[in-house]
Design a protein with these regions (language model features):
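Active-site catalytic loop in hydrolytic enzyme cores
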Residues: 61-63, 89-166, 171-185, 265-269, ...
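Conserved hydrophobic/aromatic positions in well-ordered beta-strands
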Residues: 6, 100-102, 230, 250, ...
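Extreme N-terminal starter segment of soluble prokaryotic enzymes
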Residues: 1-5
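CN hydrolase (nitrilase-like) catalytic-core segments centered on the catalytic cysteine
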Residues: 61-83, 150-249, 331-346, 411-499
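Short polar catalytic/cofactor-binding loops
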Residues: 9-14, 301-307
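A short C-terminal boundary segment appended to hydrolase-like catalytic domains
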Residues: 257-293, 502-532
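Ligand-binding pocket scaffold of soluble enzyme catalytic domains
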Residues: 6-8, 135-138, 299
Length: 532
């Protein structure tokens, strides 16, 4: 089935009535393209800055208000689904940031609150206290979320595992890495179409712009909506995208038969999930134990096992090889080459034991194999595997805590997340994937970013992903000028050997903004569907 999806990006201000008029104007403009579903930006009723709790309450809307009635009438007039986002008055004086979904009859069918509040949003707004509803629209199942809820993987994932195959994301962000990374990766990992609509124009009142720019360490000229609203295919390919700074209606026809399709090698990543392994995702973050973390070290990714000795001699403390690069002889050769060093070499091998044959990641030191990590998910190209792993195993090294994510396990956001919950500083990924463009373009950078871990992967391309020092907003002392991104790591990649510096100690800082932690702030209370 083909449906037309659309996003209408525009600017808003501090006049609630004027903002409603703008929304209605953009709905009418978008209706010319006759979309089935239209998404509007986040914080549609008012800029996300308030003078007081009373001010926040005053500019919020009620669920039965001019906003829902007039947008409902527009939805009925144009016979389309509309998602808009406003702050909403709730019981006991609470105000939430809420995605409101109107059906083509004009009826409000869902009011889903934002789960992960970003920075100053948490001063006056309350987070969601229940999982977002998935709405059966007949032609598709619609899942809604807002901005920061997509910078971490849990909220889109919970929607997808409950059947959503069209994801709707309203944003109010100045971050350029939303459009480049955090938005499209959620489509690909969940095999769903995605419509994302980001605001343009100033995100702050003019009289408070200088204050926020100084306190956040961000140039005032960059505190504008990033635009680039987009429609993303279930393989992570952006099929339509808006401009950076101008009003626009972004439209694309979506073939819903692409939802949930297997990967090129036949692997069904939705069916192959292992909920029983993910139990830690629905539990509080464990209290981190203290372990050594190096400030910096040299890491390499290479397809050539014969380069290992020279890479270690030249200073690499971690070398990652592609999957299945090892046998007994090469393990012995590598062990000998590491004599007198603290270096670690990672790859994988076939491993037979009493319960079957596994695809097993191994870490090798000067004393031999020091870590075994079985692949956790089935992969079609490895039909010989009949024994899977049931947990993420870690190794404390001289440079920090290491986990191996074997092969296509990295495609599942749950596994690197479990590594982060185990206070891992570096993830090694030996793989031979590359079946889809998003594997290297989106997946590897995002797994490092959303978990604040360094990542070294060897495969069709060799990739070293390092955490930057400048990360937390509201930290005005920066080592380098703000580049417009809020959570994009440093990436070195090539088809030949890659060597780059990584920083294990930087994994300690997961605070993306004031009061917003990428790992400790994850909505674990609402993640039961991930483990069912």
């Amino acid at each position: 089935m083909i449906v037309r999806l659309a996003a209408a990006q525009y600017a808003t201000g501090c006049d609630v009535d004027e903002n409603l008029d703008t929304a209605l104007r953009m709905i009418d403009e978008a209706a010319r393209a006759e979309p089935t579903v239209l998404v509007l930006p986040e914080f549609g009723n008012h800029l996300s800055i308030y003078d007081s709790a009373e001010h926040c309450w005053d500019v919020a809307i009620d669920l039965d208000s001019a906003w829902t009635r007039r947008i409902g009438a527009a939805a009925a007039r144009h016979a389309m689904w509309i998602q808009f986002n406003c702050t909403v008055r709730r019981e006991a004086g609470r105000v939430t940031n809420t995605n409101l979904l109107i059906d083509p009859s004009g009826r409000l069918t869902a009011a889903n609150d934002k789960t992960v509040l970003m920075g100053a949003e948490g001063i006056y707004l309350s987070p969601a206290d229940r999982p977002a509803d998935v709405v059966d629209a007949g032609f598709a199942r619609l899942g809604t979320y807002a901005c920061m809820d997509g910078v971490v993987p849990e909220v889109p994932r919970t929607l997808a595992v409950r059947g959503a195959n069209v994801l709707l994301n309203s944003l109010n962000s100045f971050a350029l890495d939303e459009a480049s990374t955090h938005i499209p990766v959620r489509a690909a990992e969940n095999r769903a179409w995605l419509v994302a609509c980001c605001k343009i124009g100033p995100l702050l009142p003019p009289d408070r712009l200088a204050e926020f720019a100084q306190n956040m360490g961000v140039p005032s000229a960059m505190l504008r909506g990033a635009g680039e609203s987009q429609i993303v295919r279930p393989d992570g390919v952006v099929v339509a995208q808006g401009p950076r700074d101008d009003e626009a209606v972004v439209v694309a026809d979506a073939d819903l038969s692409l939802c949930g399709q297997p990967r090129p090698d036949g692997t069904d990543v939705r069916r192959n999930r292992r909920p029983a392994v993910y139990s830690g995702l629905a539990q509080p973050t464990p209290v981190a134990d203290d372990h050594r973390r190096a400030d910096r070290l040299q890491a390499s990714a290479t397809a050539n096992v014969h380069e290992v000795a020279s890479l270690v001699r030249n200073g690499s403390m971690l070398v990652v090889l592609p999957e299945l690069a090892l046998d007994d002889a090469s393990i012995g050769t590598i062990t000998a080459a590491l004599a007198g060093t603290d270096a670690i070499v990672v790859s994988s091998r076939r491993h037979s034991s009493h319960d079957g044959t596994s695809h097993c990641g191994v870490a090798i030191s000067a004393s031999g194999v020091v870590l075994h990590q079985r692949q956790i998910h089935r992969v079609a190209r490895h039909g010989w595997v009949d024994a899977l792993g049931d947990s993420v195993v870690t190794l404390d090294t001289s440079f920090g805590r290491l986990a191996i994510v074997v092969g296509d396990d990295v495609l599942y956001p749950e596994i690197p997340r479990l590594a982060a919950l185990a206070a891992v500083d570096v993830i090694a990924v030996p793989w031979a994937s590359g079946g889809e463009p998003w594997d290297v373009e989106l997946c590897l950078p995002e797994r490092a970013a959303e978990n604040r871990v360094n990542l070294v992967a060897a495969g069709p391309e060799n990739v070293v992903v390092s955490l930057p020092a400048d990360f937390t907003l509201w930290a005005p002392e920066r080592r380098r000028p703000f580049d417009g991104t809020i959570n994009l790591p440093d990436i070195a990649r090539a088809h030949q050997t890659v060597t780059a510096e990584i920083h294990p100690v930087r994994s300690l800082n997961r605070r993306i903004s004031r009061n917003t932690d990428l790992v400790d702030g994850r909505p674990w209370q609402l993640c039961q569907s991930l483990t069912d």
